[in-house]
A protein has these predicted regions:
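Glycine-rich, phosphate-binding/catalytic loops in enzymes
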Residues: 40-44, 74-75, 134-136
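Conserved alpha/beta-hydrolase "nucleophile elbow" surrounding the catalytic nucleophile
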Residues: 95-100
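Catalytic nucleophile-loop/oxyanion-hole region of alpha/beta-hydrolase
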Residues: 64-76
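Conserved HGGG/HGGXW glycine-rich cap/lid loop of the alpha/beta-hydrolase fold
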Residues: 5-66
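Conserved alpha/beta-hydrolase catalytic His-Asp/Glu region
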Residues: 128-130, 148-198
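Flexible "cap/lid" loop of the alpha/beta hydrolase fold
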Residues: 101-104, 108, 115-145
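Conserved acidic catalytic loop of the alpha/beta-hydrolase fold
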Residues: 73-92
Length: 199
């Protein structure tokens, strides 16, 4: 069973699993709406074995991010969350993609809050091509164009039958995976933070 909520400092979460220990999963981005629908099912499936012994919290970023908010600022929000909601840690953390950028700062600035750290699909700095695609994705999503946003990553695939097939599948299934953002400007703030990130 999954449960959605918001921590006292405004960070949204989705919780599932059983056990005395907790694991925080810093969700990717850009976008701070917690996963739902098919995307949530994909995450619960990916963490199924871990959730048999742990309570897994998928956390995003708080809503209403001001212009210029950085991945380091976001890591400070997570530090407050760990202190307030998880007895000051230490706690296991998995940073996925954009969440991995944030986890790097948390580990560097607050190592006492982390027991174990896994960084997946993230580097110390994003590649220029990827950052441009993320920005385009954020721009389209912030306009509510979910299908168009979903196809932005296809720019990395050469033209041909394979690309056309992927485009069709993405176009077909996007409504099951993505919804229009609650706070569109936050996508742009996060995409800009990703462009500035250099841990």
């Amino acid at each position: 069973m999954t449960e959605k909520g918001v921590f006292s400092n405004g960070i949204p979460y989705v919780r599932f699993g059983e056990g005395e220990k907790a694991v925080l999963v810093f969700y990717g981005g850009p976008g701070n709406d917690p996963p739902s629908g098919l995307m949530l099912r994909m995450f619960t499936g990916a963490f199924k074995s871990l959730s048999q012994n742990h309570v897994v919290y998928i956390v995003t970023r708080k809503f209403g991010l001001p212009e210029g908010y950085t991945t380091r600022d976001m890591s400070e929000d997570y530090a407050v969350m760990i202190r307030d909601e998880f007895n000051g840690g230490p706690i296991d953390v998995v940073g996925v993609s954009f969440g991995g950028f944030i986890a790097q700062h948390l580990a560097a600035d607050h190592p006492n809050l982390i027991r174990r750290l896994v960084i997946a699909l993230a580097a110390y700095k994003g590649r220029e091509e990827s950052l441009q695609l993320d920005m385009r994705y954020a721009e389209l999503m912030s306009q509510g164009k979910t299908r168009e946003a979903s196809t932005t990553m296809l720019a990395t695939i050469p033209d041909g039958i394979k690309k056309s097939f992927y485009k069709f599948i993405i176009w077909l299934f996007t409504p099951l995976i993505l919804s229009k953002p609650t706070n569109p400007n936050d996508l742009l703030v996060e995409a800009k933070a990703a462009c500035e990130h250099d841990s």
